[in-house]
Amino acid sequence: MTTPSDLNIYQLIDTQNGRVTPRIYTDPDIYQLELERIFGRCWLFLAHESQIPKPGDFFNTYMGEDAVVVVRQKDGSIKAFLNQCRHRAMRVSYADCGNTRAFTCPYHGWSYGINGELIDVPLEPRAYPQGLCKSHWGLNEVPCVESYKGLIFGNWDTSAPGLRDYLGDIAWYLDGMLDRREGGTEIVGGVQKWVINCNWKFPAEQFASDQYHALFSHASAVQVLGAKDDGSDKRLGDGQTARPVWETAKDALQFGQDGHGSGFFFTEKPDANVWVDGAVSSYYRETYAEAEQRLGEVRALRLAGHNNIFPTLSWLNGTATLRVWHPRSPDQVEVWAFCITDKAASDEVKAAFENSATRAFGPAGFLEQDDSENWCEIQKLLKGHRARNSKLCLEMGLGQEKRRDDGIPGITNYIFSETAARGMYQRWADLLSSESWQEVLDKTAAYQQEVMK
């Protein structure tokens, strides 16, 4: 097996000087190491609690390329298991979601309870006359499963920091989506899934760090939908709220720490000029007082923003899109997109959120297609030997990082910077090159201390 020292990880990433070698997006050995040391050691989003409300409810997803099933237990707790029969490695759960009393392998009929225990083996007395220790052959359980305000995460590594410590200061930014109203959030509708022919790090980096692209990649949408905001509840494109926020915002910042990233504008209006139908904008205006009381002015107004929890959980404030970038190969990622809304919103508002999220950021969304085209074209170019071994510039905002004194936490910069991208690649390199989580944490702390000198 190729080792981290063979790959010279830190020769491919130079975050202190803002350099990245695009071989990191194409190398199959790097990809295999990512599956082991990133997706095998980091906290990964599994599901929202609203998707499995009752005992026996399950949801099938992935941790890296490993299929897992998340199940609500009889006592209300949540477990996750490798979706693999212990007999011949067959998948035991095929439906995307549902409710069940047991998971039965279609190959030889081995059956497992929702707690993962092997409960039935067909023809057991005749097939195993010597006896079979069924307690030894239950489903492989994900050892670490925790929830944060409705979001369920899993981790294979018992030595990893707890979920809240892992999130760190990104939790403050995440709360701006999860904690706007009493009752929290829920997933509306199903999951939209599609494949993009690019490396998973392209979308993760963009959602962590890149507001810069919107001025150019989404220029056509800005031109078509950039009408003045008249404060009405008109539908998108009919003179309401699509004016680009960078034209009206008072200020903006980017957060980048521990591999996570976020960026947002300081806006003046509760609807924040986001790419949504007027019904959604009206909802934000009507619920602003509650959000401000719970979150404070900055986060209550923070509806135009991009975010990524390392490695692959992204969301956009305002447009209600939550998505996971499931890696499929060095040059392919599968997108799973959810619509997340306040649970207290009316059914009509939830439907408007879902329509707006799909229109802008669904697989055929007028903004999503701009992004996908960029990532796919880059991946095509990186088939070239010189292209994938050149150096790329990651210097935007280099040396301008600061910690604020107004209660906004973490390492920050102006929104048009690459602080979060540099931090993401530093955490990426630290994970790939370290044998233990403590080593990772020490390296990341040293990097962040150097950044803030």
Curated annotation (Swiss-Prot):
Binds 1 Fe cation. This is 3-phenylpropionate/cinnamic acid dioxygenase subunit alpha. PANTHER family: 3-PHENYLPROPIONATE_CINNAMIC ACID DIOXYGENASE SUBUNIT ALPHA, CHOLINE MONOOXYGENASE, CHLOROPLASTIC. The lineage of its organism: Bacteria, Pseudomonadati, Pseudomonadota, Gammaproteobacteria, Enterobacterales. Its cofactor is Fe cation; [2Fe-2S] cluster. PROSITE patterns: RIESKE (PS51296), RING_HYDROXYL_ALPHA (PS00570). The gene is hcaE. Pfam families: Rieske (PF00355), Ring_hydroxyl_A (PF00848). NCBIfam families: 3PPDioc_HcaE (NF042946). SUPFAM superfamilies: Bet v1-like, ISP domain. The keyword Iron applies. Residues 44-142 form the Rieske domain. Its EC number is 1.14.12.19. This dioxygenase system consists of four proteins: the two subunits of the hydroxylase component (HcaE and HcaF), a ferredoxin (HcaC) and a ferredoxin reductase (HcaD).
